[in-house]
């Protein structure tokens, strides 16, 4: 039997999943996206050349890998075509390597218009979405009115369904939000112009994955965002609109849940967050700015500067529980180089003085929380590009070991730079 490995984020996204997926796909036959949309921003650096993917799985640059967009992903046709065109201009034969589920919900211009209208209306209480229509598209899916890739096979029926839903959403846009209506004919023309390209890539993903598993193929599932942005388990309402956790693999791809063999949690050596929402270890000082600059913490999708802070072990332990993590990959260890001391958040002090070591479930429960820190010596030596575990500074090794002790999960991979080969694989997930 084959082995199925899940790669997902353990924090608020931006942990470095894309690089790790790209690295590990050297052995994989399939790479599957199972949730989210083009709100993801997965950055790959190969031989110094940077590639940012938003919708297409990170395995697309490997000629031996088939990339799959599963049913749990909301798919923006225009965004997919843009990404395909850019990759094809660089010589990547995307259409030979990419497959789609016919059950993918479509993100269309009225979703984007609604997303931005709602954020504008929220004012100071805005969630901080990427403004790309992700939430409204999932909303249509759950309400059973959304259009899917499968609808593109019958263009006449698609046109009728589209007209109904455009009228439905335009009423809200114009009369409630006082925004401009979406042009039905333009949306229809734009989608139909590329419909045949999309339908040509459609397969029965569940059937394909089950057959691949039986044939002993190695399959990797690529998560987007992070555990603490999960619609059910994250810092609600400051979350995304999909299940970013390991449970989303089965529902978002059609793989049977018993067939997940290893779950790799990507954990950044410190914490970051984009947009609004709780962030107990946030640093609004020189150290926070140091982390932002050294880590180049600016969103691959939005360009927004990320909030930065110390590694929150309490939050990461929640990710361990929810995802039943098999191991960690620690990324951006090199960003901590040069700090005299480093801190780990090992508990929270509540407003009433109680000390706890678990995360609240709703955003309101995080208000007034103070982090309880464990302080460790930093290191002056560089870890950037180090490829042997034994050559890391002792203080860095101590930091890694302490994270393992506090979480109960081994760190199987360590990333010391953005390039594919600036990585130490201590235990390969496909062999674990």
UniProtKB/Swiss-Prot annotation:
Keywords, sorted A to Z: Cytoplasm, GTP-binding, Ligase, Magnesium, Metal-binding, Nucleotide-binding, Purine biosynthesis
HAMAP family on file: Adenylosucc_synth
GO MF entries: adenylosuccinate synthase activity; GTP binding; magnesium ion binding
Gene: purA
Cofactor or coenzyme needed: Mg(2+)
Residues annotated as binding GTP: 13-19, 41-43, 306, 332-334, 415-417
PANTHER family (alphabetical): ADENYLOSUCCINATE SYNTHETASE
Residues annotated to bind Mg(2+): 14, 41
Places the protein is found: Cytoplasm
Cofactor binding annotation: Binds 1 Mg(2+) ion per subunit.
Entry protein name: Adenylosuccinate synthetase
GO terms classed as biological process: 'de novo' AMP biosynthetic process; IMP metabolic process
Function: Plays an important role in the de novo pathway of purine nucleotide biosynthesis. Catalyzes the first committed step in the biosynthesis of AMP from IMP.
UniProt-annotated catalytic positions: 14 (proton acceptor), 42 (proton donor)
